Amino acid sequence: MPIHDWPEQERPREKLMARGPTALSDAELLALFLGSGFGGRDAVQTARDLLQAHGPLRVLLDRPARELARLPGLGPARSCTLAAGLELAHRYLAAELEHGEAVGNNPAAVGRYLQHRLRGQAREIFMALFLDNRHRLIACEELFHGTINAAPVYPREVVRRALLHNAAAVILSHNHPSGDPEPSSADTRITDELQQALAMVDVRLLDHFVVGEGRPVSFAERGLLSPPQPRLFG
């Protein structure tokens, strides 16, 4: 049955207007981006087909636009619409960190942003947020990329980037493609090495977030960061 023949309260657009976007299923939300169906199936059925064959939702939407365009029912126009929607969501979350407020005072916003950037990635990515002396965001960079199990991390490069940005503080993050956000012993070891290396140039490590499924794990919240050491000189 075409969507326009459905009861009005069950049509995705009307349901969203009446009850809000959280009332819609993944397939119904995706159908609103598609606009119409494919191969004799309506937009919701097409969305369900895509999710069943290529999902779940994050796996489907993590694909590059050129790869999405090759999937049945999408094509260049719809894949670009989906990619644009994701980029808007990314910029919306980034805006929480980019309006001159102290990032270090808003760990929830940092966690949401990093979760959006890193969760569901097929390989490990190591990122750094560089902050000024009032803990406002200067830059956010992906520094290292690895395999499904690990990304090589070089403290010297992190320090170099911090100095380049004249950063006073840094927040680190990486993802676990396995989905388990619990820090490993290697995570703890490299965090300690990075904290010591940054301290040598008077840059403070505020936190290290590990992103997987669910809520990111914060080293600072867990008490896993070493206390700042007093400077010997100066």
From Swiss-Prot:
Residues annotated as binding Zn(2+): H174, H176, D187
The answer to whether keyword Metal-binding applies is: yes
- In chain numbering, where does the motif JAMM motif fall? 174-187
Q: Does the keyword Zinc apply?
A: yes
Question: Which GO terms of the molecular function aspect are on file?
Answer: metal ion binding; metallopeptidase activity
Do you know which PROSITE patterns this protein is assigned to?
MPN (PS50249), UPF0758 (PS01302)
Start and end of every MPN domain? Answer: 103-225
Q: Which family does it belong to?
A: Belongs to the UPF0758 family.
What's the protein here called? UPF0758 protein Smal_0281
